[in-house]
Amino acid sequence: MDFEQLLDKSLNKVREEIKTELSKSLDEAIKLLNEGHTKIIQEYTQRINELITKTKEEIEGEKARLEVENKRTLLVEKEYWINKVYERVLEKIGEVVKTKEYKDAIQSILNKEIKEMEGEKITVYCSPNDKSTVEKVVGNNKNVTIKTDDKMLGGIRIYYEGSGLTRDFSLKLILDQVFDSMRGKISDMLFGGK
């Protein structure tokens, strides 16, 4: 073997060693890149999932807030229309107080209360429109004082001076009580339900 062959052989051997080392280094670099890539993918996947979860929670919170706001708005709107019905009923009281049944009811209540008072002094409050009806029932009874109340829409309110007791048969009070007890039914009629 001559020198050149020996040199070639040595160079080839060194080349092979370098090539093997480079191949190992390349494989190691690729392995490190793949591991880094996988780690980065996992890390960002976790961050993305956390952001998605947080966003979902925010959306659910906003959705719940909007549902509450919508319910509140609906309740306000329902209350508005129920109050409109109440106002219309109040407007109709003027027609009710003109009926014979109304006047008969006032007379019946007064007759019963005057009988039960047994000489106690009373003051009967009524609307100016009902004064003549009340005067007819009271007649010359000295224990009864009649006073008009411009705020009363109809009906009577009786104050017993001896006991300090007041019995209220005013149409407004009766209407309020009936309306409150029927509020659910009125809501169902207006907006559907049950």
Swiss-Prot record:
Topology in the lipid bilayer: Peripheral membrane protein
Compartmental location: Cell membrane
Annotated keywords: ATP synthesis, Cell membrane, Hydrogen ion transport, Ion transport, Membrane, Transport
GO function term, MF aspect, one: proton-transporting ATP synthase activity, rotational mechanism
Pfam families assigned: vATP-synt_E (PF01991)
Family matches, as SUPFAM superfamilies: V-type ATPase subunit E-like
Chief location of this protein within or outside the cell: membrane
InterPro entries: ATPase_E_C (IPR038495), ATPase_V1_Esu (IPR002842)
Gene Ontology cellular component list: plasma membrane; proton-transporting two-sector ATPase complex, catalytic domain
One GO term (biological process): proton motive force-driven plasma membrane ATP synthesis
Family listed: Belongs to the V-ATPase E subunit family.
Quaternary structure (record): Has multiple subunits with at least A(3), B(3), C, D, E, F, H, I and proteolipid K(x).
Function: Component of the A-type ATP synthase that produces ATP from ADP in the presence of a proton gradient across the membrane.
Protein name: A-type ATP synthase subunit E
